[in-house]
Amino acid sequence: MHSISYFWHLSRLIYGPRNFQENKRAVVFFARAVSNRALFEELYDFFDHYEPMKGFFDQHDPDFQEVMTRVFLFKDSTMRQRLDALKHHFTILRTFFSDDVIHELYWGKGYTLWTSPDESLPLEARLIFDTGQRKEGFLSLYLYHEGQMIYHFNFRFDYNADGTPSMYIGTIQGSKHGLETTKVLTKKLFGYRPKNFILYLMRIFVQTLGIHDMYVITDEGFYTNSHMLRGNRSKKTNFNDFWLGEGAVPDTKEKWYFRLPIEEKRRKYGEIKSQKRNLFRKRYLLMDTIVPPYIAAIKALFRQGFDPVPSAIDEAAITDKPADYDPIEAPVK
């Protein structure tokens, strides 16, 4: 078992003597770590036997251990719950991806899953681990424009109440300075907002992995609501409106999450005003060019022998289309 002095030195390594707030956090980390040494030993034992993450805390990212002592992920989470979430995430992750891929995700720069070939639409989607985003999840899907982040999801894999591997999204965040860029991109994406576009990519990611259940954090469940006194540091983003607009529904088995459909249904002729049909047709044709290489890039990361049945088949994923293909289905007569 690690000594008390080990945890004191660790607390100073993570926080350092930078200011009063950091000193306070160092003391809190130390006190909580020492009083929960058995849980920390469980954490260390798990990662010592997890090949792609061996030495991660000592050699690469000691700050990641802060997940143990701070109320992250969701409202009022306990250290036991956060440790279980960590173990579940990495256990599930290893069923999907090879050890080399996991090592690159957490020790390296991650993977580009799609880059636009259109110079007038310089977008890139990347799957990465950003230690600064560990408060809401253990992996991120980023959307970049000209190398600058526009939106990103922070998420983790976990078992739902039925014991099924699922995705839990802890936040969606946008650039504070990306409003003007968002307007430009929405036009270039034929009316598709970048926020909705990255959600679409996330849904395709889930489908490709064969995951059937996708959960999204609610306003009430966001981790910052664990703290009674936060002043103007409280979360100002309204998640619920966006999720509900995308078809999310409450789930009696999930206290802090909505269940979100894993599919985004294409609108049909009867659901689109006649003057906007050409816009939607162009948008769907664009998605038809984006999704197949995006799926191929995801599958290239799979562990050998992992060949899941997609949990849904998006229309853009179908590459064998007839010559008279219309991205908007003909109206029912």
Where are these regions (language model features)?
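Acyl-donor binding region in acyl/amide transferases
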Residues: 151, 160-250
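Hydrophobic transmembrane alpha-helix bundles
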Residues: 195, 249-262, 290-302
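Non-catalytic substrate-recognition and accessory regions of acyl/acetyltransferase enzymes
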Residues: 1-184, 279-333
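Generic preference for flexible, low-structure residues
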Residues: 157, 183-185, 210, 222, ...
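Active-site/acyl-donor-binding loops of N-acyltransferases
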Residues: 220-286
